[in-house]
């Protein structure tokens, strides 16, 4: 790894700096495709919200790089004890010595990882070539490509008028089984999907008598004008009937029923070509071509 020149210092982030320094820095750089990190947001307000929901808290997981008193880099992580994984928020660096700063941040952050973390993940726009170079240097290997797709409100004129039912307790068990079949290592379990249901998180389903054919899990963040489809699943025996399209169309109508919501996003694996065609056929546009990379700990 590249040595860090003496003029740089690495520091923890204070509680006050999370909102006044860290969030604006991450969001500003994240708006550039060549710097984009999938786990970071593009506005300070959304970044503050994301940082506020992290576990452990950012003061325990982030390090900042300074040249004198100028902030030039940041890196931290969020974790999931069940998956044993840490997602890296960065590296975000604004300096010509990009790789030296990134290497120093990575070296400083790794000792902060909790014991339950067995694997690290980077998630970056494929145009972020410096992050890719760092991933290779740090021993990460590719975990697959995906697309972040965007759909704006004015595209609803071309969306069919499809409806889906709200999930009822009669199909709770079937949903958990289907979710595990299709997403065995998802960051959300079927039980967690059920627990997340509230005014802003909706599970919509298609059924045939007592049988669950498919579901979509969508959420809205009206305070930020955004919606997001987290999961779309159709039982294998029910495929080829256009049910995925119906579910996504119904989710779009639910999300845009909120006047505050102006745009929605979803993520699709690049290798899942039928799903990508479905989303693009409804009007979604590719915003970020993304790459995940992982490295085991130890």
Question: Which positions does each model-derived feature cover?
Answer:
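Conserved acetyl-CoA-binding loop-helix of GNAT-fold acetyltransferases
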Residues: 98-111, 137, 234, 240-253, ...
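Conserved GNAT acetyl-CoA-binding A-motif
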Residues: 113-125, 256-267
């Amino acid at each position: 790894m590249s040595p860090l020149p003496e003029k740089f210092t690495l520091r923890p982030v204070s509680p006050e700096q999370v909102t006044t320094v860290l969030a604006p820095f991450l969001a500003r750089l994240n708006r550039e495709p060549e710097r984009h990190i999938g786990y970071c947001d593009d506005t300070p307000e959304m970044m503050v919200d994301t940082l506020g929901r992290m576990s452990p808290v950012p003061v325990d997981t982030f390090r900042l790089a300074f040249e004198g008193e100028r902030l030039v880099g940041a890196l931290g992580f969020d974790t999931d004890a069940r998956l044993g994984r840490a997602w890296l928020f960065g590296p975000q660096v604004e300096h010509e010595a990009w790789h030296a700063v990134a290497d120093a941040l990575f070296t400083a952050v790794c000792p902060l990882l909790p014991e339950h973390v067995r694997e690290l993940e980077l998630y970056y726009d494929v145009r972020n070539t410096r992050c890719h170079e760092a991933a290779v240097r740090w021993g990460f290997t590719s975990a697959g490509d995906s697309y972040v797709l965007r759909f704006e409100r004015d595209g609803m004129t071309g969306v069919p008028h499809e409806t889906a039912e709200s999930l009822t307790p009669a199909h709770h068990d079937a949903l958990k089984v289907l979710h595990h079949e299709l997403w065995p290592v998802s960051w959300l379990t079927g039980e967690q999907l059920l627990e997340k249901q509230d005014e802003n998180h909706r599970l919509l389903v298609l059924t045939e008598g007592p049988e669950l054919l498919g579901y979509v899990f969508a959420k809205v963040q009206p305070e930020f004008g955004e919606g997001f489809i987290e999961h779309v699943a159709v039982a294998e025996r029910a495929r080829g009937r256009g049910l995925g399209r119906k579910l996504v169309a119904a989710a779009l109508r639910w999300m845009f029923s909120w006047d505050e919501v102006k745009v929605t996003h979803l993520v699709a694996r690049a290798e899942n070509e039928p799903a990508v065609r479905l989303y693009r056929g409804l009007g979604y546009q590719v915003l970020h071509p993304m790459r995940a990379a992982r490295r085991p700990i130890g």
